Amino acid sequence: MKVLVVYKKSAWELFSRSEDPNVAHFMEQSGRDAQSVEQSHHVQKESMETITSTLIESGAQVSILYRSELSEEVTKNIDLAVTIGGDGTFLETSHFIHEEVPIIGVNSDPSRSVGFLSACNGSEFPDFFSGLDKQPRFNLSRARAKINDKVTGPPILNDILFSNPNPAATTRYRMGEKSFRNSGCLFATAAGSTAWIFQEGCAPLPLENNETLQCYHRGNRNANTSTSNSFSLQSLTRKGRIYIDGEHLSYPLSIGQTLELTTGPSLTVIGDLERKRKTFLTKYNLNM
């Protein structure tokens, strides 16, 4: 079995190499926040060692990759993908994973990361992997974006935002016969319906095999959530942008251009996501 392991660098690794004097000053302090960053680094390193040794001992052919080095080429011909980090690492990896390849998310430090898409943490991975064939699997629907009828970006697992790149500026766009002036338009998949759009006040969607998309107009008083299998939007913003699954991946959507969202290829995720989702929603006195 060919396994691709994708990891994130800890904040301590990134901060300790920064040339920013403010970051350097922060790292030199002995306060609680700086200590927490270093402690998390050791936890994540231990998770990495546990996971990789478990995979190697199983006889798997293991390739290890930093998440910024991901490409379609390196994800070809693999049998399984394992992400070590949090939801951000999982989302970034999902952009390069074909629908026939299963993926496991491992939360490298549960004290600092929610890891909603993670099946287990580092210390739990050996037991989880030994019973891999018995673990639940979910087919999560992804969305596909087109700008002026041209496929743009990777499959979208969580959400996509259209907005002015300046958060203090007005975003202008048209959907059908109606024009909007607000803080941007946020779309989410079923998997993403308990993420950003949920914190905007929208209700979660059922998780598995759900091709429905949600749409929410940010910054409009008493805005309602609409659902559909597809959405179309025309930008009336001169320098608008779309942001896919967070802040790291974006594309321009200039005035006059059209964004179309439809169902894309699904993603096979290993782990009991329904259990984690129910636990999360009980905090808000909600049930699916």
Describe the function of each predicted region:
Residues E72-E73, G86-G88:
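Beta-loop-alpha module in the N-terminal Rossmann-like domain of NAD(P)-dependent dehydrogenases
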Residues D79-L80:
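Structural motif
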Residues T83-I84, F187-A188:
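Redox-cofactor binding/interface segments in oxidoreductases and associated redox assembly factors
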